[in-house]
Amino acid sequence: KPNILWITVEDISPTLSMYGDSTAITPNLDKLASESLIYTESFTTVGVCSPSRSSLITGMYPVSIGTHQMRTGKDVFGWGSREYDGISNAIDVNGDSIPLHSVVTPPSVKCFTEYLRASGYYCTNNSKTDYQFAAPVTAWDENGNDAHWSNREANQPFFSVFNFDVTHESKMWLHRDKPLTVDPKKVPLPPYFPDTETVRNDVARNYSNIELLDQMVGKLILELKADNLFNNTYIFFF
């Protein structure tokens, strides 16, 4: 059985050289793209974070399973230190209590990794489970910042997810004190943005974060090659 590696990223749009925008220097992604099938006409089922992720993990439309409203789970970021009543004796894959207002999907709705695990795959998630519903403990063999295919049994096929959030919109401010690697004077600006120093710096930060992302992808591919797994692994980048 082949191995499967998902590399998921956030908030970059098609701002990559394989889609015609070479502002960010991304040698690792360029190399991967040159050896890959590139999708140029793809669509999302819903255009916001968690509802979209619920569709990816279940293979179902969010409106069909009640996960289309952002947000309906626990306060994952602790904004306002909200208090809520939990469902009695119910915890999610992270060991957290499940709030009463969480989406409860129909019993027939499964995380597709449950089927992969039943087929012998070692499934790891590093590390988001922000699905709008509580991920069941049966979804992953490993879940968290240390989850990795290297912990599987010898010769066991794996399905591994690495969610790199370095390009998440919030990181434009988190990394605001770090040096820019892309010149603000050279970034393309959409016509609906004012051409100001602040806007150019923000856009340059986004492109600089894409260059950081490229390094992370390169490191992951090197790990595959070091483990002699690269030639038997399907890699999805989206």
How would you label these PLM feature ranges?
Residues 6-8, 13-107, 121:
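Active-site segment of extracytoplasmic enzymes that catalyze sulfate/phosphate-ester chemistry
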Residues 6, 27-30, 110, 114, ...:
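Solvent-exposed, polar/charged alpha-helical surfaces in well-ordered, non-transmembrane soluble domains
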Residues 109-135:
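Short, charged N-terminal beta->alpha structural module
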Residues 8-9, 126, 237-238:
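Generic enzyme active-site microenvironment
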Residues 14-24, 47, 70-72, 78, ...:
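Active-site-proximal cap/lid insertion segments
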Residues 1-5, 35-40, 118-124, 155-159, ...:
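Loop/turn elements at helix/coil->beta-strand transitions in domains of secreted/extracellular proteins
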